[in-house]
Amino acid sequence: EHKAFYFACRAIVICIFKLLYRYTVIRECELPKNGSYIIASNHLSNTDPVFVGLTHKRRVYFMAKAELFKNKFFGGLIKILGAFPVTRGANDGKAIATGEDLINDGKVMTIFIEGGRTKTGELMRPRSGCAVIARQTKAPVVPMCITVVGNKKNIFAKRVIHIGKPLSYEELGFSNDEEPSPREYREASRIIMEQISKFREMDRKDK
């Protein structure tokens, strides 16, 4: 699994990012050291996957747009670092299955719940992929918000990374007694996004 390579890269990148960026991490609680969970984050820039990895002590796997894997070298590198491809704008069953396998194997994975980067800086409508994996695996979902404070066009502007408490299967509105439905997935996605939005409003006030 290239675990040693992942954590060696993580240590190097932490040093680089501390020199380049100003960022604050807010943790609502200590996250589990064992067992699987899903990190559901908003998506502002190409540095977001790096900030997710830096702020979690455990190894993190994440979905990345399929286009990034067209370059064999770069695609191979990010695969070693935990990325797996997802086709945006499509119901990518293979990516969902890969995510479920990782969660069932006790891993931690990240999903950018909006399905892509925002062009305006505002939050977008959540996609259902995170809710689908949470429903199928019963894994808790950790809402996370990355907020740029100040001038959003400044790539080195201060960031606040806000990591929330895990939302349980029941807190997401899922039930063992019912077959999953699109409405159920939409409601779970809304609950997750509501937390992300709450963090964003709090953290935008941080000057």
Please give the residue ranges for each predicted region.
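Membrane-anchoring hydrophobic helices of lipid-metabolizing enzymes
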Residues: 1-38, 47-51, 56, 80-82, ...
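A secondary-structure boundary/capping signal
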Residues: 27, 64-65, 82, 112-114, ...
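Catalytic core of membrane glycerolipid acyltransferases/transacylases, capturing the structured
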Residues: 32-90, 98
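Soluble or luminal CAZymes and related metallo-dependent hydrolases
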Residues: 4, 8, 91, 184, ...
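Non-catalytic C-terminal accessory region of glycerolipid acyltransferases
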Residues: 94-207
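Residues at the C-termini of beta-strands that transition into short coil/loop
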Residues: 29, 66, 87, 145, ...
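A generic secondary-structure micro-motif detector
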Residues: 2, 63-64, 88-89, 119-120, ...
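Short amphipathic alpha-helical segments and helix-helix/interface helices
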Residues: 13, 52, 75, 130-134
